[in-house]
Amino acid sequence: MSDKTLTRMDLSEAVFREVGLSRNESAQLVESMLNHMSDALVRGEQVKISSFGTFSVRDKSARVGRNPKTGEEVPIQPRRVLTFRPSHLMKERVAAGNRK
């Protein structure tokens, strides 16, 4: 496993190299795509990217948790959580990469 992290700048640079837009236009394109995805998730919509996966927001209800050190019951507030479900193709690509 690598310690490398793919950043916005890396994505912008890839768009610049592969699509041929200027660096500024590439950065704007990446930022616009991420904003569209974020806005859709905030509205509770799914973001499905073919051959990659699906991002969605789930509502978790309130529940009672337990402090592992003391054993004391602690209320956990209801919240929204972001989930990602990779496509079968993405799962296969990751698994194939692990076999190298």
UniProtKB/Swiss-Prot annotation:
Family annotation (InterPro entries): Hist_DNA-bd, Histone-like_DNA-bd_CS, IHF-like_DNA-bd_dom_sf, IHF_alpha
One GO biological process term: regulation of DNA-templated transcription
PROSITE patterns linked: HISTONE_LIKE
Pfam families registered for this protein in UniProt: Bac_DNA_binding
Domain of life, per lineage: Bacteria
Record carries keyword Repeat: no
Matches recorded under CDD domains: IHF_A
Cellular component annotations (GO), alphabetically ordered: cytosol
SUPFAM superfamilies per record: IHF-like DNA-binding proteins (SSF47729)
Keyword hit for Heme: no
GO MF, one example: DNA binding
Keywords: DNA recombination, DNA-binding, Transcription, Transcription regulation, Translation regulation
Assigned protein family: Belongs to the bacterial histone-like protein family.
Record's subunit section: Heterodimer of an alpha and a beta chain.
Cited NCBIfam families: himA, PRK00285.1
Name used for this protein in its record: Integration host factor subunit alpha
Species this chain originates from: Ruegeria pomeroyi (strain ATCC 700808 / DSM 15171 / DSS-3) (Silicibacter pomeroyi)
Gene: ihfA
